[in-house]
Regions:
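N-terminal binding-site loop/beta-alpha segment at the start of enzyme catalytic domains
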Residues: 1-68, 187, 261, 266-269
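Acidic-and-aromatic substrate-binding clefts and catalytic sites of carbohydrate-active enzymes
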Residues: 21-25, 43-53, 77-82, 108-112, ...
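Short acidic capping loops at alpha-helix termini that bridge into adjacent secondary structure
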Residues: 13, 64-68, 98-102, 130-131, ...
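Glycine/small-residue-rich loop that forms an oxyanion/phosphate-binding "nest" at active or ligand-binding sites
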Residues: 73, 77-121
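Generic structural signal for well-ordered alpha-helices
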Residues: 31, 51, 55-58, 85-92, ...
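Beta/alpha (TIM)-barrel catalytic core signal, keyed to glycine-rich beta->alpha loops juxtaposed to Asp/Glu
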Residues: 108-269
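Short, acidic/polar
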Residues: 22-35, 80-95, 142-143, 164-165
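Acidic (Asp/Glu)-rich catalytic clusters
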Residues: 5-6, 55-67, 89-98, 122-124, ...
């Protein structure tokens, strides 16, 4: 199950997020376990401090590099044209890789995001990264970027769940062919026990987590759940293997409440 990005890049639609996964052997082991279970998409970032561990887990798996999609991100302190290029070099060195599959601007930093984007365009043109995108960009950020960019982002990674559906941003992304990745698709656990989620899950013979992930997949999203438990990793990946009924989707669609569980980029200028 992949999403076709520009340039023939295939993005696996269920990925493993490693935000706040402890550095060192913990992340390394989780990544290897996930890859052994069938994950082929790992999402890290410079600010997470575990880029090297992700790459080590990939190597431990024995899988060919070409079979695993690796995303990392440019942190705020490294934005700006020259700084972004240096930070990318550092990420590549930390990971010991020759190429990154997807490189994202982590946040729409005022006064620097356009110059940072030009750096990402250069990296993609040079073949050092296969696809480029953004994270936490709302409609006004995207409209500004699209009016200045030589090429639009391939991806926008934002928080999305049935409780925070981001319909306006998603519609804009669809208009410009920008894939939407959903981080915190499980609401950091805050709504797994919601009565309607539990009801839909029971009717489908699935878990609440699988139902939330499947909702995202059926809306065309790439979902990035995180877990350190092998059983949960397998459970999340199995969201690919069933389909929710139109009635179940409508019930989940009705749960919008503007729930933000992390950063809120809607307030970013």
């Amino acid at each position: 199950m992949t999403y076709p990005l520009r340039g023939g890049v295939a993005l696996p639609r269920v990925g493993l997020g490693v935000f706040r996964t402890p550095r060192g052997q913990t992340t390394r082991g989780i990544v290897k376990t996930a890859l052994d279970l069938g994950y082929r998409h790992i999402d890290t970032a410079r600010i997470y401090g575990n880029e090297r561990d992700v790459a080590d887990g990939l190597r431990d798996s024995g899988l060919p590099r070409s079979e695993v999609f690796v995303t990392t991100k440019l942190w705020n302190d490294d934005q700006g044209y020259d700084a972004a290029l240096r930070a990318f070099d550092a990420s590549l060195e930390h990971m010991g890789l020759e190429q990154i599959d997807l490189f994202l601007l982590h946040w729409p930093v005022p006064g620097k995001r356009l110059a940072s984007w030009r750096a990402l365009e250069r990296l993609r043109a040079e073949g050092r990264v296969r696809a480029i995108g953004v994270s936490n960009f709302m409609e006004h950020h995207l409209e500004e970027l699209l009016s200045h960019a030589n090429e639009p982002p391939s991806v926008n990674q934002i928080e999305v769940s049935p409780f925070l559906q981001q319909r306006g941003v998603r519609a804009l992304c669809e208009r410009y062919g920008i894939a939407v990745e959903a981080y915190s698709p499980l609401t950091k656990g805050a709504r797994l026990a919601h009565p309607e989620v539990v009801r839909v899950a029971a009717a489908a013979g699935r878990t609440p987590a699988q139902v939330l992930l499947r909702w995202g997949l059926q809306h065309g999203l790439i979902v990035l759940p995180k877990s350190s438990a092998p059983a949960r990793l397998a459970e999340n990946l199995a969201a690919r293997d069933f389909e929710l009924s139109p009635e179940a989707m409508a019930a989940l669609d009705a749960l919008e409440e503007g729930l933000v569980t992390g950063w809120d980029p809607r307030r970013a200028p």
